[in-house]
């Protein structure tokens, strides 16, 4: 398969909603010693009329109710249930966690998974955080923005998870899929499979761990990828020179440039006035379509009589130039 291209954008959002509300993540300021903190809510289902592909996913074995089994090589992860019941399996031991249990930890290297427990009512809300290893690739906001963005798009719109893309993203967040339990040294095998296939081979084939469409702090993501010789070629840095919209407007000329005999093709030559409504966007936000006209014409077209005169003047100029 070709390297993945996102289907939606969620960068810059403190709260991201995936799978039609089945999963909601709220990014928060982390406490000292932790590299991220978010509050996350899983629902058992989404009621009411929803798109067919979402209903099919909810009714399938692949319904998002928690991440697959994984381990973190360098970080300890922390969980604190706010409401509902969290199911968590750590190194084969299954536990049922409620708000009364307070904060629990999963040590680095422990194979674990967590999920909304069947005993939980309609939803389950939990606070998650992790220790700060100081590594380029670790559990942090960038990783979770990209993992949840990809998970959503892959299951709903892309026909499922691409194994190389999955490993590339997981490797970008110190999250590694262990080998089956019967494989000796399953953690080591899982770790090096993610690194070799996800980072090294995937990087050479064009697979990125992070995407601009999902990532709020893109400068940080670029710095992470530049740290790997296998991913450095995937990084584009011209975005750093892009000016803000305000700066772009300051560069706009006060008058339209003239183009000599090529001018007519840069003007509105239609004899019919172009009637436009008031702008529907303000500061990038959609304000809704309006019925009334802004001012009769849009300023780039003229009335019929004026247009006839304009066309006549252009015709005379062309004729004079050809004589």
Curated annotation (Swiss-Prot):
UniProt pathway = Mycotoxin biosynthesis; patulin biosynthesis
Name the InterPro entries on file: RmlC-like_jellyroll (IPR014710), RmlC_Cupin_sf (IPR011051)
Family matches, as Gene3D superfamilies: Jelly Rolls
Listed Basic and acidic residues bias regions: 305-316
Look up keyword Signal and say if it applies. no
**Principal place where this protein is found?**
other
The UniProt keyword set, sorted, is:
Cytoplasmic vesicle, Oxidoreductase, Vacuole
E.C. no: 1.-.-.-
Task: Write out the GO cellular component annotations.
Answer: cytoplasmic vesicle lumen; vacuolar lumen; vacuole
What's this one used for in biotech?
Patulin was originally used as an antibiotic and specifically trialed to be used against the common cold, but it is no longer used for that purpose since it has been shown to induce immunological, neurological and gastrointestinal effects. Genotoxic effects of patulin with dose-dependent increase in DNA strand breaks in brain, liver and kidneys have been detected in mice. However, more recently, it has been proposed that patulin might also have anti-tumor properties.
Q: Which GO terms describe its molecular function?
A: oxidoreductase activity
**What does the sequence similarity comment in the record state about its family?**
Belongs to the oxidoreductase OpS7 family.
Provide the protein name. Probable oxidoreductase patJ
User: Which organism is the protein's source?
Assistant: Aspergillus clavatus (strain ATCC 1007 / CBS 513.65 / DSM 816 / NCTC 3887 / NRRL 1 / QM 1276 / 107)
């Amino acid at each position: 398969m070709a390297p993945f291209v996102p289907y939606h954008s969620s960068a810059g959002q403190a709260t991201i909603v995936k799978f039609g509300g089945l999963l909601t993540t709220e990014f928060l300021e982390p406490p000292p010693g932790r590299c991220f903190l978010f509050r996350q809510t899983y629902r058992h289902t989404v009621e009411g009329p929803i798109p067919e592909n979402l209903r099919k996913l909810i009714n399938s074995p692949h319904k998002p109710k928690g991440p697959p089994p994984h381990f973190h090589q360098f970080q300890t992860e922390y969980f604190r249930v706010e409401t509902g019941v969290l199911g968590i399996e750590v190194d084969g031991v299954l536990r049922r966690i409620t708000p009364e249990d307070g904060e629990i930890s999963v040590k680095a290297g422990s194979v674990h998974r967590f999920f909304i427990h069947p005993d939980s009512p309609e939803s389950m809300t939990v606070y998650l955080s992790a220790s700060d290893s100081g590594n380029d690739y670790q559990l942090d906001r960038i990783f979770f923005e990209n993992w949840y963005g990809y998970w959503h798009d892959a299951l709903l719109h892309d026909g499922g998870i691409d194994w190389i893309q999955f490993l590339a993203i997981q490797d970008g967040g110190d999250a590694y899929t262990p080998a089956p339990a019967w494989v000796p040294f399953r953690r080591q095998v899982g770790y090096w499979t993610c690194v070799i296939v996800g980072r090294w081979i995937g990087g050479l084939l064009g697979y990125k761990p992070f995407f601009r469409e999902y990532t709020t702090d893109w400068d940080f993501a670029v710095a992470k990828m530049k740290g790997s010789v296998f991913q450095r070629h995937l990084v584009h840095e011209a975005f750093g020179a892009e000016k803000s919209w305000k700066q772009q407007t300051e560069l706009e000329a006060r008058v339209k440039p003239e183009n000599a005999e090529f001018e007519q093709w840069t003007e509105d030559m239609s004899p019919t006035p172009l009637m436009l409504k008031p702008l529907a966007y303000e500061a990038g936000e959609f304000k809704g379509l309006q019925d009334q006209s802004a001012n009769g014409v849009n300023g780039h077209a003229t009335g019929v009589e004026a247009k006839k005169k304009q066309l006549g003047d252009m015709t005379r100029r062309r004729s004079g130039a050809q004589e």
